């Protein structure tokens, strides 16, 4: 299916690109989440009329994400979990836990924005974590996991 991207999509393209994707990806994800639209002649003409407006909105989102990223970059978040004697946690620290902890510090971060490439944190100590505020803005945060002896 041919679609027009209404915003930048990772591994697919930028605003205004006309790309071919599988029908299910377009129907079930891109179109319902307002990231794309079917590439018909009328849709292409309507997009060209709204292009400047969409580019301005995308630039504003990027500027807001960069401003938030400057505040968030290098922050340390402390999370306490029950742990054993050997420093391994009972359970784990997930991206949702990190997003909640950042929220208590005044940062608006959703759990989908927290990137844990090696999976949930399962040991006590400091762990570097990437937070993707925008497709072009990724900042590093240190998560200090403190163990509570049981």
Curated annotation (Swiss-Prot):
The keyword Ribosomal protein applies. Coiled coil: none annotated. Transmembrane segments: none annotated. The keyword Ribosomal protein applies. Keywords: Ribonucleoprotein, Ribosomal protein, RNA-binding, rRNA-binding. Binds to the 23S rRNA. HAMAP family: Ribosomal_bL9. This is Large ribosomal subunit protein bL9. The lineage of its organism: Bacteria, Pseudomonadati, Pseudomonadota, Betaproteobacteria, Burkholderiales.
């Amino acid at each position: 299916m041919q679609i027009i991207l209404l915003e930048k999509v990772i591994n697919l393209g930028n605003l205004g690109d006309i790309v071919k994707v599988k029908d299910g990806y377009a129907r079930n994800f891109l179109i319902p989440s307002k990231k794309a639209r079917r590439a018909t002649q009328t849709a292409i003409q309507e997009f060209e009329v709204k292009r400047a407006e969409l580019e301005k909105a995308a630039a504003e989102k990027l500027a807001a994400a960069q401003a938030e990223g400057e505040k968030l970059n290098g922050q340390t978040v402390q999370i306490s979990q029950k742990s054993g004697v050997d420093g391994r946690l009972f359970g784990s620290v997930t991206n949702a836990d990190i997003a909640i902890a950042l929220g208590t510090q005044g940062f608006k971060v959703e759990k989908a924005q927290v990137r844990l490439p090696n999976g949930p944190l399962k040991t006590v100590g400091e762990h570097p974590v990437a937070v993707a505020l925008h497709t072009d803005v990724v900042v590093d945060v240190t998560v200090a996991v403190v163990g509570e002896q049981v």
